[in-house]
């Protein structure tokens, strides 16, 4: 359990109350850093720190593992026939009926690299880095609808209002950057069913929530000051505003007022750093081509490059959401389009981090909220054909870097891709693994709220996936 007896006191407030000079503040900061290193770590830091930061590529809508990673020739053999009742007994689905016919894979597969990992021909770039990836084919989740499943993957709960993974990391271990947020969110491809609760701070102090960068040419608004306002004038205005806010906080005691002060201060610092962060002109043409970045175009590729730049500058948790994978109809066309949008840049991010020497301590995670059914979804009433429904029982994700074992595959599914048959990995197990790679014991990182101790991985026993940790 983390305890913060002065959680809602700002540094500025404390220093003003005590009358400490700026020089002494700087000296105290240096001494504090040295003391922390000498006296040990927080109680929840129980493991070697293998990853210092996370870049999470969330594929909203749920990619079809059967068209990308999990090759099932048996489905082709029995296409058009119903799934055996013994396989589907007791299962629930969002749209299809239990007697829906089998749909075979829409694309050919091949083995790649020394690892022999199988990829469909829709992933020509990722397949080239097969030996850098840790593939998990035995993921399963508790939810079969998008909003709760997306929330479950990102916050550990299918109910809105819980703290997201990035918020937990910001709260627990902070950020390496003083002039950039510790938790940044970028989006492409459309809307998300889970909404902004997926990067919310929940019951944690709101300064730990994710900071969304906008889609388009200007990810951060109002970087430049209005005409006639220089940094000195802005600093004076901000100091006055903060003084008024502190006065209000002294009367009301609302911790959100302190969060607002922190937000204003971060915005002020970001104004100086953001232009350099977002300026791709110093990136080589080779790098731009590697990602597939086009000048003046904002998309998943440019978000991946910006994610690498944020990671270089100390942002702890960077979450990229790319939506559009919900293939209830025409799964073939869906996978063609979405894989084309993300394959090159996803692979480029891993390659770029590796050549910069950053992959070793940067964890990259790729995947959606659940998988897709081996059975076809077809409905004349809904104008759907040759699609796949939601499948929480088994799906595939991959990881790279950050202390994971490259070139291995964890878990298996049955010959139909319906059930996990080896090394099942629950969503909370994945979350526990990410925390452990960051040095954190997931059972000890908690926060007391309304009389309960909450943690990202819930109260049921879950464990990190030791097979994939180097």
Segments the model singles out, each with a brief description of its role:
Residues 1-470:
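Ligand-binding pockets and gating/stacking loops
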């Amino acid at each position: 359990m983390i305890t913060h007896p002065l959680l809602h006191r700002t540094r500025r407030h404390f220093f003003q109350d005590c009358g400490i000079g700026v020089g002494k503040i700087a000296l105290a900061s240096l001494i504090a850093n040295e003391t922390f290193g000498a006296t040990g770590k927080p109680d929840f830091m129980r493991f070697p720190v293998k990853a210092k930061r996370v870049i999470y590529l969330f594929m909203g809508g749920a990619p079809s593992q059967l068209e990308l990673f999990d090759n099932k020739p048996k489905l082709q053999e029995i296409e058009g026939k119903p799934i055996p009742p013994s396989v589907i007994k007791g299962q629930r689905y969002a749209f299809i009926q239990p007697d829906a016919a089998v749909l075979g894979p829409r694309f050919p597969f091949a083995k790649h690299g020394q690892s022999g990992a199988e990829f469909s021909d829709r992933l020509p770039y990722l397949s080239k880095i097969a030996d850098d990836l840790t593939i998990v084919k035995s993921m399963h989740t508790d939810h079969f609808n998008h909003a709760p499943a997306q929330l479950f993957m990102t916050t550990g709960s299918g109910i809105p209002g819980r703290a997201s993974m990035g918020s937990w990391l910001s709260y627990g271990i902070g950020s390496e950057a003083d002039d950039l947020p510790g938790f940044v969110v970028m989006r492409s491809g459309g809307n998300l069913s889970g909404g902004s609760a997926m990067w919310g701070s929940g019951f944690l102090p709101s300064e730990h929530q994710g900071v969304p960068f906008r889609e388009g040419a200007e990810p951060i608004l109002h970087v430049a000051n209005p005409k006639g306002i220089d940094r000195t004038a802005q600093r004076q205005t901000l100091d006055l505003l903060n003084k008024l806010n502190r006065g209000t906080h002294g009367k009301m005691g609302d911790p959100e007022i302190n969060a607002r002060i922190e937000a204003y201060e971060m915005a002020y610092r970001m104004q100086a750093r953001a232009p350099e962060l977002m300026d791709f002109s110093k990136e080589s043409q080779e790098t731009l081509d590697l990602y597939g970045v086009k000048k003046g175009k904002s998309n998943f590729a440019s978000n991946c490059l910006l994610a690498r730049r944020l990671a270089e500058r100390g942002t702890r948790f960077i979450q990229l959401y790319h939506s559009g994978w919900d293939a209830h109809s025409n799964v073939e066309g869906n996978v063609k389009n979405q894989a084309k949008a993300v394959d090159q840049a996803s692979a480029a991010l891993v390659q770029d981090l590796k050549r910069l020497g950053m992959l070793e301590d940067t964890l990259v995670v790729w995947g959606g909220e659940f998988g897709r059914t081996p059975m076809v979804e077809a409905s004349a009433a809904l104008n759907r054909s040759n699609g796949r429904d939601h499948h929480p029982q088994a799906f595939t994700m991959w990881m790279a870097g950050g202390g994971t074992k490259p070139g291995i595959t964890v878990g298996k599914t049955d010959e139909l891709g319906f059930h996990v048959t080896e090394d099942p990995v629950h969503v909370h197990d994945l979350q526990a693994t990410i925390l452990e790679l960051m040095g954190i014991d997931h059972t000890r990182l908690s926060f007391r709220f309304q009389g309960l101790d909450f943690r990202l991985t819930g109260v049921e026993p879950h464990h990190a996936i030791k097979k994939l940790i180097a």
